Each structure stands twice: as C-alpha cells, then as structure tokens.
Amino acid sequence: VGAGIEMISLKPRTQSSWEEKTFDPTTNGTISIPHTYKVDERITTLSYEAHVKYTNKNWFIGAKSVLGSNLTQASGLGGFGIKHIDNKTKEQEYTPIRFSSSWLNVVYGQKWKPGIFVGYAKNLGTSDELVSEKLYGTGTNLDKLVTAGAELTYNVPHWKFGVEYTLSSAWYGKLDK
C-alpha cells in the first residue's frame, strides 16, 4: 500500500510578442508595430496517486488510482490551457487539465498464469474557465478511455512466454465553455 504526491512548476514561455496594427496618416494606410514583453509566467500543479499490491505463491493483485494535473512530463494525459490574458502585455495565466485514471491487474498461478487487466481514464477538464481554445498537452480532446485485457503466460526460471489481448476504446469530447 502506498501513496504519492507530485508537484511540478513549469514556465511555458519567457516573452510575449505580437504586432499591433495602426493607421499611419502619413501613408494613409495601416502599419504594424511590433511589441515584445518579458513575461514571468508559471503553472504549478499537484497530482496524487494511491496504489496497492498483494502477492503470494499463486496470486498477484495490483491496483492504482491517479488524480493528475498536467502529467504530460510523465507521459500521462493532460496539459494546460489559458485562463487569463493581460490586455497590455499579453502575459498569460494558465489552468491545468485534470485527469483521473485507475487500473486493476489480477494474475493467478505459478507455471501457467492467466491474468486480467482493466483500466479507466476520465478527463475532468479545468477548474477555471478558458479564454482561448489553444490547449497544450496530450489527449486534451479525450473524454474517457477504457482498456481491458486478458493474458496467459507460461513461466519457467528466467523465461516467460505468453499471449495477450488488449482492447482499448476512447471517447472524444469537445471544448465546452
């Protein structure tokens, strides 16, 4: 039995650049004025996990549940979006995309070991309203994911042979306001 907490703090960018279009009376046309500001942007998130494992001579049972925020650095689902943009400097504030995922793995036997695996992941969205549809991350348009698998392995000292079948289904969503 165990649990963990992960904190990550990222600087998505260090400067903000854009062009402002304005009327030029000398040419009677439109000109672009470039702007660049140094910005001090940061997104800091916390993620939590709990896991259990039981083993004896014939059984292996393992399970894990994660409530994750912006877990892309760990090859997980999630990311972040923009919750505020400063009108003058274009400095941005961010909010994490949160995912919940859980899985269970059960294996029985010694030489011949049948096993099953089931998993579920759900996009919980952001806790703050987004001001832009631009998202940064992995699986940001995923609503939920279900995985189920069965395996059969033959085990001898230093060798393991087996077959496994896994079915995964994904449901995709859209950005809601």
Tell where the protein language model's regions lie, with residue ranges.
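Claisen-condensing/thiolase-fold acyl-transfer catalytic domains that form or cleave C-C bonds
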Residues: 145
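Predominantly the C-terminal beta-signal and adjacent terminal strand-loop region
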Residues: 154-177
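Generic structural signal for beta-strand residues in well-ordered domains
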Residues: 107, 152-154
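Membrane-embedded beta-strands of outer-membrane beta-barrel proteins
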Residues: 48-50, 102-104, 148-150, 161, ...
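Detector for outer-membrane/organellar transmembrane beta-barrel domains
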Residues: 1-141
